[in-house]
Curated annotation (Swiss-Prot):
Zn(2+) binds at residues 83, 99, 106. Binds 1 Mg(2+) ion per subunit. GO terms for biological process: L-histidine biosynthetic process. One of its GO terms (cellular component) is cytoplasm. This is Phosphoribosyl-AMP cyclohydrolase.
Length: 126
């Protein structure tokens, strides 16, 4: 199996009208979802070339290598595109917490409780 050059891989991704694509970081080995961030073509290319997760900061308008200042780096082990090519899944080896709040994941402490279903899902599936 041959490995495609980064530019070919970047060209295969469907970016939105702002030139961005959502990227979900997942811990290698456990499958734990760590965070979601945005990538543009330049940050995806940097990620593919260096092996370190590099995102696009919408608030700062610049590339952002995850953990560059905190030391909480993400070593990228694999990048997968979904079936439409408009969402990326990065399998990473996370050093330290992934979230800027200091928690392991960005999905800690904000669980939205589902209301009781009006219809039993198993009943509706029949």
């Amino acid at each position: 199996m041959s490995i495609s050059p980064p530019d070919d891989l970047v060209a295969s991704v469907t970016f939105d009208d702002r030139g961005l694509v959502p990227a979900i970081a997942q811990q290698e080995g456990t499958g734990e979802v760590l965070m979601m961030a945005w990538m543009n073509a330049e940050s995806l290319r940097a990620t593919l070339e260096t092996g370190w997760a590099t995102y696009w900061s919408r608030s700062r308008g610049e590339l952002w290598r995850k953990g560059e200042t905190s030391g909480h780096l993400q070593r990228v082990r694999a990048v997968h595109a979904d079936c439409d090519g408009d969402t990326l899944l990065l399998t990473v080896d996370q050093t330290g917490p992934a979230c800027h709040t200091g928690t392991r994941t960005c999905f800690t402490g904000r669980e939205l409780v589902m209301p009781p279903a009006a219809v039993d899902p198993e009943e509706a599936a029949r």
